Design a protein with these regions (language model features):
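Cytosolic catalytic headpieces and adjacent flexible linkers of membrane translocases
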Residues: 1-118, 122, 136, 142, ...
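Membrane-embedded transport module
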Residues: 77-128, 142, 147-283
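Conserved catalytic-loop aspartate of Hanks-type protein kinases
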Residues: 131
Length: 283
């Protein structure tokens, strides 16, 4: 809960106010603002954790406010790192702290940048969600800057993604769709690479042992076109649930293994066809 004190003082007809005038005022009362998390926030945070996404709070609010919000959405707040303590830490100390601590309070925009940078240097892919002026530097520093439609214009301009709904559940859906798209994209790359490798291997073998060229360049292009037409359905292909449970990095090693495994199998069918052509020609 945020509390603002309201006070008054009779200034007469004075037009210019100076800091010294802000003394001897009469307290009228307090205004209390309680910005409760949405009812769906707790479930959304739990869903992000199941997807191996570690939610962290980076806020300029006081420690008590940050802890109160985290307790309501079940984000670990046993240890809170403040901006003052962060300034005293070396880069190596901060690098270890960002792995263990999930709540950072009383931060300046520069301190938010430092935290995001530390997470990225540790090998994490960082998505930063913010809607205020103070969040703009961190939005630019993160791998993916995320804002909402009701944010200030500058924050929306700095963000890579603007959510049309102020709901963390949208993030869960976006992550799932992104992982499905990534998986299907890998399928296309693997299929295409294996096909091309198999074609090259077949042509090399044919050139070494056959007195004629069994496949022309036009026929190879036609085969690739047919492959691409078949791959049009890949965006709608089913993705196994285990493929979406954790983030995946692009790795050329898996592509190489797949290509070396399935490319020769494709070539084997080509070679059998070539041998049939040789037999047919001799007969």
């Amino acid at each position: 809960m945020k509390v603002i004190a309201v006070a008054q003082k009779n200034m007469g007809y004075k037009k210019q106010i100076i800091p010294a005038d802000e003394t001897g005022m009469i307290l009228m009362g307090y205004l209390a603002f309680f910005d409760a998390p949405k009812k769906t926030a707790k479930a959304s945070v739990a869903a992000l954790k199941r997807l191996k996404v570690a939610p962290k709070i980076l806020t300029g609010d006081q420690v008590d406010v940050a802890v109160s919000v985290c307790q309501r959405v079940e984000i670990s707040s046993e240890t809170v790192l403040t901006g003052a303590r962060l300034d005293e830490m070396t880069d190596s100390e901060l690098s270890m702290a960002v792995e263990e601590i999930h709540v950072f309070a009383e931060l300046t925009p520069g301190q938010k940048i430092r935290l995001v940078s530390a997470l990225r240097q540790n090998g994490h892919t960082v998505g930063f969600l913010g809607d205020g002026i103070n969040d703009i530097p961190a939005l630019c520093e993160a791998n993916v800057g995320i804002s909402v439609d009701t944010a200030v214009d500058a924050a929306k301009d700095a963000a890579d993604v603007v959510l049309l709904q102020k709901d963390l559940g949208v993030l869960e859906q976006g992550i799932l769709e992104g992982r499905k798209t990534f998986t299907n994209m890998l399928k296309y790359i693997k299929i295409t690479a294996s096909s091309n490798f198999g074609n090259i291997l077949s042509i090399v073998c044919a050139s070494a042992f056959l007195p004629f060229l069994p496949v022309t360049s036009v026929q190879i292009l036609l085969l690739n076109l047919l492959y691409d037409i078949l791959c049009i359905v890949l965006p709608w292909d089913n993705v196994d649930e285990e493929e979406t449970l954790s983030p995946r990095d692009w790795s050329g090693r898996t592509l190489g293994r797949f290509m070396l495994s399935f490319g020769p199998i494709s070539s084997l069918f080509d070679i059998v066809t070539f041998l049939f052509l040789v037999w047919y020609k001799k007969s």
